[in-house]
């Protein structure tokens, strides 16, 4: 009788822990504070690059229209411009010098991931961009169910999930958006996209 009581107590503790983790994950926005922008080894103000200089997303994130991940640019991509452009402020010059030093010493830049997905989930950027930029598809809806007025270009497609990156000093998940499974399923449903488990889960 005593071993059964001990086993029952252990099971209760384990189940309580699992329930607590699930509740924290569900009510955190996003889970465990991961939505806060992580600090990066080099400051990269999208406001300067995208809003002021009109550099398109796919110039730096070259894989975004071709594969699963958007990927961060290689140092060589940064030097395409910053071999000659020093930056307008002392702070900008210091950050650009970090890029040049990384290139000169053949040291990769250890960028911190901003958007995290569980290992069992895949998000194929190319498929989303192909769908939203396809002009032969009629009405399309954004992540919150808002009707998109026309087929967006690549940069506008990025804003559907990432928010207005051009006006963000620091990239972080879209304001008020946790990008949980339900968010993805809702967007798939409103756009009549399959919601089979295997579409997004490995």
Q: What spans do the regions from the language model cover?
A:
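N-terminal start-of-chain detector that recognizes signal peptides
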Residues: 13-17, 28-32, 48-51, 92-97, ...
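Sequence context surrounding c-type heme c attachment/ligation sites in exported
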Residues: 38-88, 121-202
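Hydrophobic membrane-insertion alpha-helices, especially the h-region
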Residues: 6-24
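Aromatic-capped interface at the extracytoplasmic side
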Residues: 20-38
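Primarily the internal scaffold of c-type cytochrome electron-transfer domains
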Residues: 85-121, 194-195, 199
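Short secondary-structure boundary/capping segments
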Residues: 33-34, 112-113, 176
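Cytosolic-side transmembrane helix boundary signature
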Residues: 1-4
